[in-house]
C-alpha cells in the first residue's frame, strides 16, 4: 500500500518530462497527421486529467483541458478555461501542499503534490497533481502543464490500514492494562478471604464492574478517545438506581475522560455503591446518595455524598483498609489522582480527583 509521499514520488517519476526532448524522438516530417491534431486527439483520449495554463496572462489561467479533466472535476470546459486552477481547492485543502505547488511554479520546477480538491457538486477527491513548465525553442517559459491523477481510493485504503493498525495497537495496550487490573483484583480479593463462596462472589462483582467500565471505553468511532463522565456514572450506577429509584441522584457538567481514568473511576464507584448497600446510606430506607462532579483546570473532582444512613461511630470513622479500598486507592494513585474519605456522622463523603487527560 503506497503512502502519501510514495504516491507523489511515483507520479513524479512517471510524469517528469524535464529530460525529454520531443524533437529528438518525433520528427514532424514523419507524422501522418498535423502535430496539433495529434496532440489534441491524444490528450482527449487519455484517461489522465490534463490542463495547460498560460503564465503570460494575469493569474496564469487555464487555456486548455482534456475530456478526462472535465470528467474528474464535473465542470464544463467553458467553466474552467480562463480561471486559475485554485478554484478547485476548498475548506480542507492542505495549505502546506498549496504552498509547495506555488513555490514549484514560481521556480519553474517540476512539482508533484497530493492535494484534496473539490468537484463542481462539492464532493472532495484526492489527486496527485503534477505541474511542469513547457519551454519554447528559444528556452523561454511558454506554458505550464498540469495533470491530476485521482488517488481517492488509494488514500481511503491507506487510511483504513492506518486505522486498523492503530486499533490493533490500542487493543494490545488495553488488554495489557485489563490483565494488570485483574491480577490486582484477584490478589487483593483473596488476601483476607477465608470463605471460598464469599471470595467468588466478591471477585465476580469486581470483575463485572471492571467489564462494565471497560465497555465504556470501547468507542463507536475509531478516532473517539474519551468517555463522558455522565455516561460512566449512569452505566455503573444503573443497577442501584433501578433498585433505589430516586434515592440515588447525579449532577454535573459534560466532562470527558480517557480510558484509564474511566476504569479507575468505574471501579471506585462500584466499591462505594457496594459498601453503601451493605453498610451505608443505601442499607436503610431513609438513606440516599448524591453523586456530583466538576472540573477545575485540568482535574475532574467527583464527590460521593451519603445522607440519612446509619450513624457512623468513632471506630467506623477510622477503618482498617479493606481489599477494595486498597485496590481503588492504588489505581487512583497510579493516575496521579487522589481520594479523600470523610466518615462524618451525617454520612460518608468521598472526594475523588483525577486528571482529565491521562497518557495511555
UniProtKB/Swiss-Prot annotation:
EC numbers for this chain: 2.7.13.3
Domain of life: Bacteria
One Pfam family here: HATPase_c_2
SMART domains reported in the protein's UniProt record: HWE_HK, PAC
Residue positions, PTM S-4a-FMN cysteine: 85
Modified residues (Phosphohistidine): 173
The entry's keywords: ATP-binding, Chromophore, Flavoprotein, FMN, Kinase, Nucleotide-binding, Phosphoprotein, Photoreceptor protein, Receptor, Sensory transduction, Transferase, Virulence
Keyword tRNA processing applies: no
Residue stretches making up the PAS domain: 38-109
Entry GO MF terms: ATP binding; photoreceptor activity; protein histidine kinase activity
Gene3D superfamilies: Histidine kinase-like ATPase, C-terminal domain, PAS domain
Post-translational modification: FMN binds covalently to cysteine after exposure to blue light and this bond is spontaneously broken in the dark.
Keyword Cell wall biogenesis/degradation: no
Catalytic activity annotation: ATP + protein L-histidine = ADP + protein N-phospho-L-histidine
All copies of domain PAC, residue ranges: 109-163
Chain spans, region HWE histidine kinase domain: 260-303
Protein's job: Photosensitive kinase that is involved in increased bacterial virulence upon exposure to light.
Matches recorded under PANTHER family: PROTEIN TWIN LOV 1
Protein name stated in the entry: Blue-light-activated histidine kinase 1
Taxonomic placement: Bacteria, Pseudomonadati, Pseudomonadota, Alphaproteobacteria, Sphingomonadales
Amino acid at each position: 500500500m503506497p503512502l502519501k509521499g510514495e504516491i507523489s514520488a511515483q507520479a513524479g517519476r512517471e510524469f517528469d518530462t524535464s529530460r525529454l526532448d520531443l524533437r529528438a524522438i518525433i520528427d514532424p516530417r514523419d507524422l501522418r497527421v498535423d502535430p496539433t491534431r495529434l496532440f489534441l486527439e491524444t490528450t482527449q483520449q487519455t484517461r489522465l486529467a490534463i490542463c495547460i495554463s498560460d503564465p503570460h496572462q494575469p493569474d496564469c489561467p487555464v487555456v486548455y483541458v482534456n475530456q478526462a479533466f472535465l470528467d474528474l472535476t464535473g465542470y464544463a470546459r467553458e467553466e474552467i478555461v480562463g480561471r486559475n486552477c485554485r478554484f478547485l481547492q476548498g475548506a480542507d485543502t492542505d495549505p502546506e501542499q498549496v504552498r509547495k505547488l506555488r513555490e514549484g511554479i514560481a521556480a519553474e520546477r517540476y512539482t508533484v503534490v497530493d492535494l484534496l480538491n473539490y468537484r463542481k457538486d462539492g464532493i472532495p477527491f484526492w489527486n496527485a497533481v503534477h505541474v511542469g513548465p513547457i519551454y519554447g525553442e528559444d528556452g523561454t517559459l511558454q506554458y505550464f502543464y498540469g495533470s491530476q491523477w485521482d488517488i481517492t481510493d488509494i488514500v481511503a485504503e491507506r487510511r483504513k490500514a492506518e486505522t486498523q493498525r492503530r486499533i490493533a495497537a490500542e487493543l494490545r495496550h488495553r488488554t495489557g492494562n485489563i490483565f494488570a487490573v485483574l491480577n490486582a483484583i484477584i490478589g487483593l480479593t483473596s488476601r483476607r478471604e477465608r470463605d471460598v463462596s464469599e471470595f467468588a462472589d466478591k471477585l465476580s462483582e469486581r470483575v463485572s464492574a471492571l467489564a462494565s467500565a471497560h465497555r465504556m471505553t470501547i468507542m463507536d468511532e475509531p478516532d473517539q478517545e474519551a468517555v463522558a463522565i455522565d455516561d460512566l456514572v449512569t452505566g455503573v450506577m444503573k443497577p442501584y438506581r433501578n433498585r433505589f429509584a430516586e434515592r440515588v441522584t447525579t449532577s454535573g457538567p459534560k466532562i470527558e475522560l480517557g480510558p484509564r481514568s474511566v476504569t479507575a473511576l468505574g471501579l471506585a464507584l462500584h466499591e462505594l455503591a457496594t459498601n453503601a448497600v451493605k453498610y451505608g446510606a443505601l442499607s436503610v430506607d431513609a438513606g440516599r446518595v448524591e453523586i456530583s462532579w466538576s472540573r477545575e483546570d485540568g482535574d475532574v473532582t467527583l464527590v460521593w455524598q451519603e445522607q440519612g444512613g446509619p450513624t457512623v461511630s468513632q471506630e467506623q470513622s477510622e477503618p482498617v483498609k479493606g481489599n477494595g479500598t486498597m485496590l481503588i486507592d492504588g489505581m487512583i494513585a497510579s493516575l496521579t489522582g487522589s481520594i479523600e474519605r470523610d466518615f462524618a456522622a451525617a454520612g460518608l463523603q468521598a472526594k475523588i480527583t483525577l486528571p482529565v487527560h491521562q497518557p495511555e
